[in-house]
């Protein structure tokens, strides 16, 4: 909800994940969508998965641990993007499903292949990250002032309720040279599917997160600190239901579940992130960062039934299984994994001027990462990388060029009956961009970027040797930005991403070739900022056309709506500045997604397996307690989510595992800040 004492900010002053330097968003040569702390607070999402659904062009792909890569996202039609802390440190498998968004200062989504900056994702067992990166910036201790925030929200709808409590305390000490911050959340939720059907009576979702952090600044040139996070979630498993002609099929209703009462998904993790910033000279900054993230998860999940052969054709035609079956168990219905991620980087940023009017920013960064996951979810792999990037600005023009080299070492690994051999590989990922600002209100920009990542740890069909040559995703993009008001910018861009050498898998998940090809073309628009000093706005539109070039021309499977062709979101808030409603803030949001098809491993199945267009409207109002004779430090928030009760599918794994969006819910909350 919206805090009435200050208007929400939807547009950041600077962005760092696009270049590893702080740059105003209008001057970037690439597209970066940002979700600010104010935006996150208003949406009050359960986790990162729920938050990213507000960004057109991002597909969340199913909220379940019963997948090979849980917690990854599709950007611009390309799958497998794993979220990262500070643009460099991956969260690890599953974390994207459970990361509480209240911990985040902001989220920056860089559109397009970005391995030329932060490296490829090797050994994640998929053609991952070709469409962009999702970068999380956690709240951390700061030296500005003492601050305490307490917030509680309750949401109630038909067959569902949710209660959240949050606190955020920052204390400055040692004469302003040190600070400690403690952020925490707790969440209790009864989703619709545990109050009816096969899962009726299951225990609700219980989750909590604690995130202490510390910062110390002994002098003006050195600042160091540490961020930590401890997470625990125990929730009823949910994998969705089959879809047929836009509605639930196979004997299921909108808010049914195939899971049993005792099916659970449990996630635990801790993260330690020490860091140091050293301003060596006026022009030279050194940044050191590292992280250790260890997580474990386990799940038991009964899936919706799916048939084969004639029975499958019968389902395509009728939406029902001729056998009458509704449920099934598989080798993946019960699994667990221990995940370890270690990351280390040293970033040198040299920012200077030549001849008084030529600016130059040189970034050099060596880094190292190691990751492993038990249970067959990831081979132990080390990545050694180095980045070289230079940016030159003169008058109207800013030119950026960079290249990154990565060396991968994948250890020998045994999972069940599968033996993965040791492998090593190399990849070079370049990028370049330009922005031209002939007028204060007009910016032209463009970029060419390439991600090259080896595919390590894949299981192949008999006789096919493992592949270590990298797949490639190459983007060409151009656009223009207009300042339509003092703090309101309109951005328009068009892009084309071509992906080559992608592993192709059979129905069992084994690689049968390395010759996959696809193309993603699109157009995006965004309008963000302040229309007036009392009216803020964020609107985003994405058009995407995906082509599977392995399929013959003219076939439906070659050019189909794997993702919605059109997606749009609008969010706004307005603060009354006079009259009886002075300091009251009203807000609203609207999300639209056009039709798309339900797939199996990303491939077209049948025209009847589709998702219909959806329209979701949210409204909210924030009223300071001073309106009732109380303190203006306290704010009452009221809201309705999914105002018109739209029934829709918000994401899917396969055509028989589609997850329904939340029904209409009414929310009340209290927030205090002092």
Protein language model annotation of sequence segments:
Residues 27, 34-35, 54, 65, ...:
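Periplasmic plug
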Residues 72, 232-247, 370-372, 409, ...:
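Surface-exposed extracellular loop regions of Gram-negative outer-membrane beta-barrel proteins
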Residues 101-151:
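A beta-strand signature from Gram-negative outer-membrane beta-barrel systems
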Residues 170, 335, 359-362, 446, ...:
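Conserved C-terminal beta-signal and adjacent last beta-strands/turns
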Residues 215-221, 337-339, 352, 356-371, ...:
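Structural signature of Gram-negative outer-membrane beta-barrels, strongest in the C-terminal barrel
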Residues 277-279, 283-291, 295-303, 443-447, ...:
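Membrane-embedded beta-barrel scaffold of Gram-negative outer-membrane proteins
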Residues 496-498, 514-601:
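Gram-negative outer-membrane beta-barrel transporters
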């Amino acid at each position: 909800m919206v805090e009435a004492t200050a208007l929400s900010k939807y547009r950041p002053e600077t962005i760092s994940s696009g270049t590893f330097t702080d740059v105003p968003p209008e001057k970037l040569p690439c597209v970066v969508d940002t979700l600010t702390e104010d935006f996150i607070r208003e949406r009050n999402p359960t986790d990162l998965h729920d938050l990213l659904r507000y960004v057109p062009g991002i597909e969340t792909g199913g909220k379940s641990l019963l997948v090979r890569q849980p917690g990854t996202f599709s950007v611009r039609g390309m799958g497998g993007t794993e979220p990262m802390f500070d643009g460099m440190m991956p969260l690890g498998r599953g974390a994207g499903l459970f990361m509480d968004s209240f911990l985040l200062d902001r989220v920056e989504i860089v559109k397009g292949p970005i391995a030329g900056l932060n490296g490829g994702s090797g050994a994640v067992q998929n053609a991952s990250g070709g469409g962009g990166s999702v970068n999380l910036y956690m709240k951390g201790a700061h030296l500005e002032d003492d601050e305490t925030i307490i917030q509680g929200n309750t949401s109630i709808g038909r067959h569902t309720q949710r209660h959240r409590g949050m606190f955020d305390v920052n204390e400055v000490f040692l004469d302003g040279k040190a600070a400690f911050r403690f952020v925490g959340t707790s969440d209790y939720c009864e989703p619709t599917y545990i109050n009816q059907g096969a899962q009726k009576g299951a225990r609700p979702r219980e989750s909590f997160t604690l995130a202490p952090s510390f910062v110390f600044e002994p002098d003006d040139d050195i600042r160091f600190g540490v961020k930590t996070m401890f997470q625990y979630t125990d929730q009823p498993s949910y994998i969705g239901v089959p879809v047929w002609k836009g509605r639930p099929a196979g004997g299921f209703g909108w808010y049914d579940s195939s899971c049993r009462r005792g099916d659970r998904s449990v996630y635990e993790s801790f993260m330690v992130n020490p860091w140091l910033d050293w301003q060596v000279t006026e022009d030279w900054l050194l940044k050191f960062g590292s992280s250790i993230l260890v997580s474990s998860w386990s799940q038991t999940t009964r899936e919706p039934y799916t048939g084969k052969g004639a029975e499958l054709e019968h389902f395509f035609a009728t939406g029902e299984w001729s056998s009458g079956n509704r449920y099934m168990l598989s080798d993946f219905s019960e699994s667990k994994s221990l995940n370890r991620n270690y990351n280390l980087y040293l970033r040198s940023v040299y920012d200077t001027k030549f001849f008084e009017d030529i600016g130059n920013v040189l970034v050099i960064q060596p880094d190292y990462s190691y990751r492993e996951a038990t249970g067959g979810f990831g081979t132990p792999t080390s990545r050694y990388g180095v980045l070289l990037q230079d940016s030159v600005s003169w008058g109207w023009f800013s030119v950026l060029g960079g290249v990154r080299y990565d060396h991968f070492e994948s250890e020998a690994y045994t999972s069940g009956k599968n033996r993965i051999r040791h492998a090593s590989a190399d990849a070079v990922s370049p990028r370049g961009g330009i922005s031209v600002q002939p007028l204060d209100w007009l910016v032209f920009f463009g970029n060419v970027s390439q991600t090259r990542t080896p595919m390590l740890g894949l299981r192949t069909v008999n006789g096919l040797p493992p592949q270590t040559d990298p797949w490639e995703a190459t983007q060409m993009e151009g656009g223009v930005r207009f300042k339509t008001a003092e703090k309101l910018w309109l951005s328009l861009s068009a892009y084309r991403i071509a992906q080559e050498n992608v592993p192709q898998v059979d129905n069992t998940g084994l690689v049968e070739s390395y010759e996959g090809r696809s193309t993603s073309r699109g157009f995006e628009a965004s309008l963000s900022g302040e229309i007036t000093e009392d009216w803020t706005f964020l609107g985003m539109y994405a058009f995407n056309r995906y082509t599977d070039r392995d399929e013959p021309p003219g076939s439906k499977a070659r050019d189909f709506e794997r993702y919605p062709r059109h997606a749009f979101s609008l969010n706004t808030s307005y603060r009354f500045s006079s009259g009886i409603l002075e300091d009251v803030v009203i807000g609203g949001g609207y999300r639209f997604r056009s039709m798309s098809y339900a797939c199996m491993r990303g491939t077209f199945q049948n025209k009847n397996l589709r998702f219909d267009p959806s329209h979701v409207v949210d409204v909210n109002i924030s009223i300071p307690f001073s309106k009732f004779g109380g303190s203006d430090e306290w704010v009452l928030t009221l809201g309705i989510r999914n105002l018109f009760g739209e029934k829709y599918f918000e994401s899917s794994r396969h055509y028989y595992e589609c997850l329904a969006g939340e029904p209409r819910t009414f929310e009340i909350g209290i927030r205090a800040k002092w």
